[in-house]
Amino acid sequence: ENCGQRSVPASMLVNRGIGLTCVCVLRRFGCPPQFLSVLRAFHDGMTARVSFGGELSDPFEVLVGVKQGCVLAPVIFNLFLVAVTLFFRSNIQTSDGVPFNFRLDGNLFNLRRLQAKTKTSLDNIFDLQYADDAALPSHTPQGLQRGLAGLDDAYQRAGLSINTKKTVIMTTPVGTDPSTHPVITVQGHPLEAVKQFTYLGTVITSDLDLSIEIQNRIRQASAAFGRLTQRVFNNHSLSTSTKVAVYKAICVSTMLYGSEAWTPYQRHIKTLEQYHIRCLQRILGLRWWHRIPHVEIRKRANIQSAEVLMLQRQLRWVGHVIRMPSDRLPHRLLYGELVHGERGVGRPFKRFSDHIKATLRRCDISPASLEFLASDRDAWNLACKEGLARLAAQTERVAQERKARRTAAASSAPSGPSCPHCGRVCASDFGLRSHLRKHR
């Protein structure tokens, strides 16, 4: 899917918080005059002091922004960003976004439903915004430049400015050289072209590969594990169950952050499982030379494999998206496909829907009953819990069978031609001839 992604953090350099701009925005959203008067009274003449080293500085007047820690600050800022988004979308063209077709009736895995000419609907993605972090997707450099200019104009009208040092541009498809990227500017400043950038803690790459994101997640989890090692994991006063509970709440959550939207391959799952087992070995006080199987390690710690923990999050997220109202963007994207772009010749990238379908089959859940089960939250959670338990049992059974085959192969009597001089058994005639040179 050919699209340009950009990360646009807004810098709160000139936020005129409770100035005329904010008052106009709140009045536009229907706030009564009495509320606006009280709100301005809270902030007019506001002073602050800085605490450092147990001492307080002299009071100074605060002319911009809202009070730190005020319960109204998040609401005011959200309304502020809504006003910015509405103004931004009113000044861009429809073709500047990323169009996609969607159809909400039928089963998720029935791709033929999107081939209908009259039952599909069209929607556009213009921006993906979370607080003051925004990503602008576009299919053309011209549309991206117009969208960025419109967003910059909207921010300036609201008293904000785009931080050009933290704003980058990334182009797909795979193999696109950043040096050939079109020049996109903000207020005359060209933006840096990169092959990857971090958005909301997740590393997004131009080739859509999860390898870098997996390594980043493991680094973050390792840092969290290291900070807790002396206080928790090496603390002999704590029980193993307590240590595993802390590990699962902090380290596993960090390792699998954002995994709800992953489309992993087996190599990614293997990397996660290796790190997962290493952490459990350190918690249980085991070393590699103890030669304890992974199944036994997880059983002692009373925790599931990294794959099962990841699939649990993904199935829970899919059920949540399916239950969303029909006007929500995640719900439409799950049941849609991009208008532009083609899947290449040969084996294409695995889609998220393909991964979910394969997971349901491994859990003995019929893909055709996805919408029916997910519509009831309790029934869906129960089906996922039972299905993942069957998946974990099947995985454990396969691992034990492989171990039994390896043990049987190692203990079986060797067969093959033997050396007439020393009696050594060789694997083949060629090996025997090579060995006979030793007795010449």
Question: Over which residues does each language-model region extend?
Answer:
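Conserved catalytic palm subdomain of right-hand nucleotidyl-transferase polymerases, strongest
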Residues: 1-27, 71, 136
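Low-complexity intrinsically disordered segments
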Residues: 7-9, 15-18, 44, 182, ...
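Short linear motifs embedded in intrinsically disordered, charge-biased segments
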Residues: 31-35, 50-440
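Short, well-structured alpha-helical segments
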Residues: 36-43
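Exposed beta-strand and adjacent loop surfaces of beta-rich binding modules
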Residues: 47
